Structures are given as C-alpha cells and as structure tokens.
Design a protein with these regions (language model features):
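Alpha-helical membrane-anchoring segments
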Residues: 1-701
Length: 701
C-alpha cells in the first residue's frame, strides 16, 4: 500500500468518535444499571478480600479498585471513568495532538475498567470489538515523544495499520461463515431477511419499508451479504489498489444499509472506521493528482498485470456467486431467482480446506508490509535517524507479529479442527492475554430468531391486581402504533437485554427478577431506563403494588393494510405468561432474588460531601433531564461543526502562509528544497529527515 498518513489520521479521528459514543452512552445508564440500588449493582463484582492492590488488579484489571482510595463508590468510579473517557474523546476529536498513543492507551484502559464490572449489560460483541480495535489503535497512533514532527509518517506505521485490516477480515469473514455453520434454515434457504427487519432488537422506521420488499429481492440480498462477508474479504490482502477500493465500498454499502434499517449503536460506525484500513492516501487525494499518476504507466507493465489480476478476481467472484447460488434471471416476473447449490458438508469441507490458506495469505501480506517498512527505514537520510527508525521497525514488527499470532486462536474457532492444529504455545499465549480482551472471536447474526413472530416481553403493573397497565419502554417495541425510533449511536442496554430475555425463560435472565424488584420499589434510576421523561411512566406518582410480564409475538403490519391496523406499525398476539405476578414481600420473588444472589447488602455508602463525589452529583443532576440520543447527537453535531470551521479557517490560513513562504524563498532555496523532498519521498521518511521533507509534509496536511 502507499502512504497512509491521511488515512491513519481519519482512522484515529474515527476511533475517537467511537469512544465518545461508547462512554457517553454508558454514562447515562450507570445509576439504573450499576448503582447501589440498580439492576445489577457494580459493587458485587469488586469484593475487597484483603488482597494487595496489584493482586486485585491481576484478578480483575480495572481502575475501579482505586475508587475507595479517592472516596468513591464503585458506581461513582464508573461515572468518573466514563466522564474522563468522554472528555478525552472530545479532546482527541478537536485537537490532533491528542490523537496520540498515550491518549488511546488511557481510553483503552478506561473502557476495559468498566467492561470488567459491566456483567451481562456489557457482554456484547461490539464491546469486545471496541476493546480489540482500541488496543490496536495504541499501536497505530503516533507517540509524539518519539517523533520530530506530529504529522510525519513513520516507516513502521504501515505494519501496525495492517492489523486493522486483519481485524476487519476476521470480523466480516467469521460473521459470514457462522451463518452457514449454525445450520440455520433461514440462512440456508436465503429467507433470513424476510424475518430480520421485524425481529432485530430495535428496528428503525426504514426497516418497516425494507420488510415490504419482494421475497426474491430479499433472497438476493442474502446472497449479496454472503458475497460481501465471505467472498470479498479475501480481496483485502491482494496487491491491487482497485480491488481494495472495491472491497471498501462493498463493506461500506453493507454497513450503511444496516445503519439505515437498524439501531446497532456504535457497532456499524466502528466497522466503517475499520474499513479505512483498505485505503491509502492516494484514494483520498484529488482526481487531478490521480490523473497525473495514471499517465506514468506505459506499455505492458506492472499496471497491466494488476488490471489482469483485477479482472480475474472480479470474474471468479461473479462466477462462483452465480454457480453456488444458482442465480437465474426470470424475464416473466422481472426477478432474479436464487437458491443455495451446495450442502452443509460441502461448506464445511471448503472451510476446513481454506482456513489455513487464509492465514497464509494474511501472513504473506504482513510479510510484505514488514519488508517494505524495512526498506523505508533504510532509505531515511542520516545515520542516527536511520538507526532510530530501524529500532522502531524491529519493535513494532515483533509486536505486530505477536498480535497476529495470538489472534489465530479466536479466528480458528470457525473450524475447530484447524484450531486444534495450532501450536500449543500459541494457545498458552492466548490464555495469558485473554482477560485483557486483546483479541476476540466474532460472528454476528449466527441464527435468525423470531421465525413465526418476534417474541417480546411486555411488563405490566397494577394497584389492585384487577386493572393492569402496560409499562412502555422508550425504544423497544411495545405500543403497536408507536413508530420505531432512530437512536444510533446510543445503545439502551436494558432494551437490548429485554430482547434477549424474550428468546428464553425468565430464569435464564436473572437480572430480570432484579429489574421487577426495583420497579416495585419505585427506584427512580431504574425507572429512567424505561422512561427518561418520568411523566410518561404510568406509575410515576407511586410504584405499582403488583407486577407481571406477558410474552407476545409481534409482526410488522403489511403494506396497504386497511381497517383498524391501517395506521399501526405493528400487530401482535398474546402467547403466554413470562413472569408471574409478584409484589414486595412475595415469597416467590424473595426466593428468586436469593437464588440469584441479588439480596446481598451493599457496603456502607460513602459521603457525598467530599469535592469529587459532589462534583459528580452536580454533573449527573445537570445532564439527567436530557435523553441519551439527544446528548450524543447534539455533541456529535457540535464537534463536526467545530472541525469544519477548523478546516475552513485553520486549513486555509495554513495553506496561505505556506504558499506565501514558498513564493518568498530565493530560487536557490527552492531548488534545494525540491531536491531534498524528492530524495526523502523515495525513502518515505517517518522519524527524521531534512527540513525540505518536513516542509512538504506540512503543506500536504
């Protein structure tokens, strides 16, 4: 790949934005989820047993162990961590000098700290993905103390940035593979999307319209999903810029369509940021510079071979798609018919055959990046800077190879026979770092749930056990006439767990018993998870005496439907009781709370009069009235506006001053600068070099 300075800058900016969304979204939910009287109090995860600080840190790597030393309870420590993470993220979004390796190290440590006590509400694949991507960002980001200029590209940066591409490959390839290895009949029958839009956790209004699309188009969309997730990721590592750009737009299209039709918090945005690893700076430059570059190729050269490789790759991709999904154009119905033309055994055999070749392909790509980094290090002028660049190249090459090696363990979970063939030392190394979430396995939408109707838990409260009132949530489906919300990048973690709870028995979701108990107690923090505007909560005046939960099946209404449901988004049917009628002091409720260990007494509350706890309380009281999506959307819009003004005025003034300086230089100086920049361009210096090289880099930025 070519120069990656601009792409890396965009990636670091994007990761800063993802951290902002993750920290601020979680911050708004801490009191209800993890408070002393929340659904799953966080203090339960940190038992002070008399061990030393470092022993505790090894058992559970989280900064929350320091909470008592600064006068904070566990949930207050979580609030402080999320606020610090939000502030650091905002700073990194606004100021490039904060997009530094040390800053991203702090962000990663902060998110790992809350993850360790997050329990079931933080056990999502995108939380693990953020931790892995966040750790890789530490390696990708510049360490300002080791660089003479903040915007200079180092020889080893292409090596560490390759790890982002490898992570993207593992994420997409595994997500496609597990759909078939799960033996889910809807994925094999190509009918998964006829259920997906109405059965996903929190659909958007666009999902209703997507659900109305004809079945043949839904099946063709599943085929396209397989191509994007299983076939195209192999192009990530081929030596063709055109194939990588094609891969980039394919992945972006899939993620954008998912964002439009579903509320998946920051997950798809994070995937889009990872997709930047498929580009280089040439893709971000103007067409004029691209045209000048294109004119250099003459005759049958490397460029011609690359074109042949591109045509071969596109041809094979199209051929295999048509063959294995039996694509046929139906001119009578103006449709494209499709069906799987291979068996489960065929797919397993293919997967087993190609798992290790995929590793070899990735290793060859990494090897090229390492060799190219060595060449760039050797091309730097000056003995000292050449030696310094070589030392960095060695260190980061070993770090990259180490991360790649460890990641092979979770990657080969897609085929356990391949996983068993890895060296025992690789498994041992993985087990040592597993607690830090450095590498993870992925596989989204393994099975399509909700076939035959979307299961949904409806909570009801009553004062007299005769008249029952439904308790509506802000985001999950409930009221059949309420339109689906648009809340990305916020993740209402209670609503998400309600979706999972509906897929099984309430005993499989112990937190639900605690949730019901808190509603009976009238806990305000838990109520705000249900309705941020307490006036919309039906039991705002006093808590209900009785609570129960019913299981319903929900379906989207059909297009053109008339009658009573014409203006409704949903239709539903009662299935059975999900949770029995309980009340405060009820023996059944007390038994379930004891069974799940939810009756333990919390430690004594710390004083709120100290400066730090009182400051945290002031911030909480100030932000409490505002819904989380409003906070996130407002802050993101403000940051984008500020960045735009910085680019408009700051960039313009820098360009003007640079141009003025270049015109004011004597002719001899210009010749010297031209010669020095040409020399340093051939070596792509990253850590040192002459003044002309640095000047040219600054003008480009």
């Amino acid at each position: 790949m070519g120069d990656l300075r601009l792409v890396r800058g965009a990636f670091l900016w994007g990761m800063s934005g993802i951290y902002l969304c993750a920290f601020l979204s979680l911050y708004t939910q801490i009191p209800g989820l993890y408070g002393r009287e929340g659904i799953l109090p966080a203090w339960r995860m940190l038992r002070f047993t008399g061990k030393g600080f470092w022993e505790q840190l090894m058992d559970s790597p989280t900064l929350l162990w320091l909470g008592p030393r600064i006068g904070l309870d566990t949930e207050q420590g979580m609030e402080l961590i999320c606020l610090l993470g939000t502030l650091l993220s905002v700073g990194a979004l606004l100021f490039s000098f904060l997009r530094d390796s040390l800053v991203f190290l702090l962000l990663w440590i902060l998110y790992l700290s809350v993850y360790q006590v997050g329990q079931v509400f933080l056990y999502f694949q995108w939380d693990s993905l953020l931790l892995e991507a966040g750790f890789l960002t530490i390696l990708v980001a510049p360490l300002r103390a080791l660089r003479s200029k903040t915007n200079v590209w180092s020889p080893h940066d292409g090596i560490t940035f390759w790890l982002i591409r490898w992570l993207l490959f593992r994420l997409m390839f595994a997500s496609g593979v597990v759909k078939l290895t799960s033996r889910c009949p809807t994925w094999w029958g190509l009918t998964a999307l006829t259920y997906h839009y109405e059965t996903q956790c929190i659909p958007t209004p666009a999902a209703w319209f997507a659900h109305q699309l004809p079945v043949w188009l839904q099946k063709l969309s599943v085929v396209a999903t397989y191509v994007v997730e299983i076939g195209i990721p192999w192009l990530f590592f081929l030596p063709s810029q055109r194939l990588r750009v094609f891969s980039f737009y394919s992945q972006v299209l899939l993620q954008v369509l998912i964002i439009v039709t579903g509320n998946y918090n920051f997950f798809n945005l994070l995937t889009l940021v990872l997709c930047l690893s498929l580009l280089d700076d040439q893709n971000l430059k103007s067409e004029q510079k691209g045209k000048k570059t294109q004119q250099k190729g003459q005759g049958f050269s490397i460029k011609s071979l690359t074109v042949l490789l591109d045509l071969l790759a596109f041809g094979l991709l199209a051929f295999w798609t048509v063959k294995y999904f039996n694509l046929q154009i139906n001119l009578e119905n103006y449709s494209v018919e499709s069906k799987t033309a291979f068996t489960y055994h065929d797919f397993l055999q293919w997967l087993r055959t190609l798992t290790f070749p995929s590793i070899w392909l990735a290793a060859a790509s990494l090897g090229w990046e390492i060799l190219y980094g060595m060449y760039r290090s050797a091309s730097i002028p000056g003995i000292f800077w050449k030696f310094w660049a070589t030392i960095q190249w060695i260190i980061f090459s070993f770090a990259t190879v180490g991360m790649f090696t460890v990641s092979l363990v979770p990657y080969t979970y897609i085929d356990f026979e391949s996983n068993g063939q890895l060296w025992p030392s690789v498994h041992r190394l993985f087990s040592k770092v597993d607690r830090y979430q450095l590498v993870n396995s992925y596989g989204l939408f393994r099975r399509m749930t909700g076939v035959g109707g979307r299961p949904e838990v409806v909570v009801e409260g009553s004062y007299d056990k005769q008249t029952w009132t439904e308790i509506e949530f802000m985001y999950k489906p409930g009221n059949i006439s309420a339109p689906p919300p648009i809340i990305t990048p916020h993740q209402p973690r209670l609503d998400w767990q309600m979706w999972f709870a509906a897929l099984g028995d309430h005993s499989q979701s112990p937190w639900f018993t605690s949730f019901v108990h808190r509603l009976l107690q009238g806990n305000k923090d838990v109520v705000r998870l249900v309705q941020n505007d307490e006036s919309l909560y039906p039991f705002n005046a006093r808590p209900p005496h009785y609570i129960r939960a019913q299981l319903f099946k929900y379906w989207f209404t059909e297009n053109g439907q008339t009658g009573q449901t014409a203006n409704h988004w949903w239709r539903r049917r009662h299935v059975e009781e999900f949770f029995p009628t309980v009340f405060i002091g009820d023996a059944t409720l007390e038994s379930m709370l004891s069974q799940h260990g939810l009756k333990d007494k919390p430690p004594p509350r710390r004083s709120l009069d100290a400066p730090l706890p009182s400051t945290l309380k002031l911030i909480r009281d100030f932000l409490r009235p505002y819904p989380a999506p409003l906070l996130l959307h407002s802050l993101i819009i403000a940051i984008i506006a500020i960045n735009s003004l910085q680019a408009l005025f700051g960039g313009g003034s820098k360009a003007g001053s640079s141009k003025q300086r270049s015109h004011s230089k004597p002719q001899s100086d210009k010749k010297k600068q031209k010669g020095s920049t040409a020399h340093s361009d051939s070596g792509a210096s990253g850590t040192g070099g002459n003044a002309g090289h640095s000047s040219k880099r600054r003008e480009k930025s």
